[in-house]
Structure formats: structure tokens, C-alpha cells
UniProtKB/Swiss-Prot annotation:
UniProt subunit comment: Homodimer.
Family: Belongs to the triosephosphate isomerase family.
Pfam families reported for this sequence: TIM
Active site: H95, E167
Organism: Fusobacterium nucleatum subsp. nucleatum (strain ATCC 25586 / DSM 15643 / BCRC 10681 / CIP 101130 / JCM 8532 / KCTC 2640 / LMG 13131 / VPI 4355)
Protein name: Triosephosphate isomerase
Recorded catalytic activity of this chain's protein: D-glyceraldehyde 3-phosphate = dihydroxyacetone phosphate
Amino acid sequence: MRRLVIAGNWKMYKNNKEAVETLTQLKDLTRDVKNVDIVIGAPFTCLSDAVKIVEGSNVKIAAENVYPKIEGAYTGEVSPKMLKDIGVTYVILGHSERREYFKESDEFINQKVKAVLEIGMKPILCIGEKLEDREGGKTLEVLAKQIKEGLVDLSKEDAEKTIVAYEPVWAIGTGKTATPEMAQETHKEIRNVLAEMFGKDVADKMIIQYGGSMKPENAKDLLSQEDIDGGLVGGASLKADSFFEIIKAGN
């Protein structure tokens, strides 16, 4: 039985004071949650205090990016070791916004995945297709490429520690929505690709999150699908009460 992992992605929102306030509320709200792993992805400037606030709770902290070197002359970058040293548990990688705005390639994302695993943290690898891919019938082709190139050369053991987050980029901010059944169909295809790479036993243990505008109103229907093992939540994670409603749907 796979355990649900529900992660919030705060993106470039919240200063340190706001982050501390929201996490304090979330920690209090979720103290009795037993069946869901809770993660918050916060901006770099908030991470150190975020880790301290949630210590001893069932909330873990994720970084939203990393550079795939332990140290060096890489001005402006943050290394996996720096994140690990302050107590970060997860790192969100390959998000559609980073692929779009910063032109991150699957090869570069794969380097980050390996660097995060090597230091003992858990990667959340984001994959997803655009509207033109969806309408052109290329969904599986695009996702399979992102998975195969993003997770190339991983051992089965490391694959099991890796979370895959499916973001239907075509459904974010376009007014188009994926039904729970459509999301399930794609998640099943993703698991089949993972099974090709790592074997069915490993694929059946891997967490596949849904990242297509999960909200309190649709969370229960999405999380009840067989191959949806949690969510990567954007806007609805910015307020503790709305994020908690999603967590309750999974719990």
C-alpha cells in the first residue's frame, strides 16, 4: 500500500515572517494526521526557519530547486549539501516553470535528481505535457521522454525514493481541466513507463503525485484514484486552512 504524500509548492511567494506564520498554523492543524506525509516547498530564504518551525511534527520541508554540485565557484547557486545541512528533506525538480523560464533540460534535471539522492534527500521530479502535446496526441511520448531521461542511470533502490509529480501544464491557468478519470489514466501510463525502467515491483512502490490545480473541492475525487498517490499543490497550499482541507481528503 503506497502512502499518500501531499506537498505544497509556495513558488516565489511568502517572506520569512509569512512562512513562519503559515507553518505554525499548519503544524497545529495537522497534529492528528496519521495517514498522509505532508511536505511544504518554500523559497530558499525561508528554509532554515521553516525546518525549525516544523521540527517534531509530521510536516517536512522541501527546497524548490538545487544546483547539482556539492560546492564550487557557482555564484548565486545553492548546493544539495547546504540544503541537507539545514534539515531539508525533499527537493522539487524539473517543475514546468523551470523548464519554461530557465530552459532546464532533462539531462540537467537528471544531474540534480542524482545529486539530491546521493546526499540523502528525496527528489520530487515534475513532468508534464503542454496543450499542443495533448491535442497532438503526444502526451505519453512527452512524459515517457521526461521520465526516461530524468531518471536515467538510477538504481532500483534510488528509484523507490524518488517521487514523480505529474503536472498537466495544459490544464494550469488555461480554464481547461483534467477529470479525475483523465488524471488516473495518465498516472497509470506513467507507472507503466516506470515499470519498463525499474520493474513492476519498484514501479508499484513509487509515489506519483498529481499537480494539476488540486484544490479542496476536487482533492477527494483525485486522491481516490488508484494510481494517484498525493498531490503537488500550488495556490491552495499558500493558506494553511485550504491546504489542510486537501490533507484531510487524503487522511
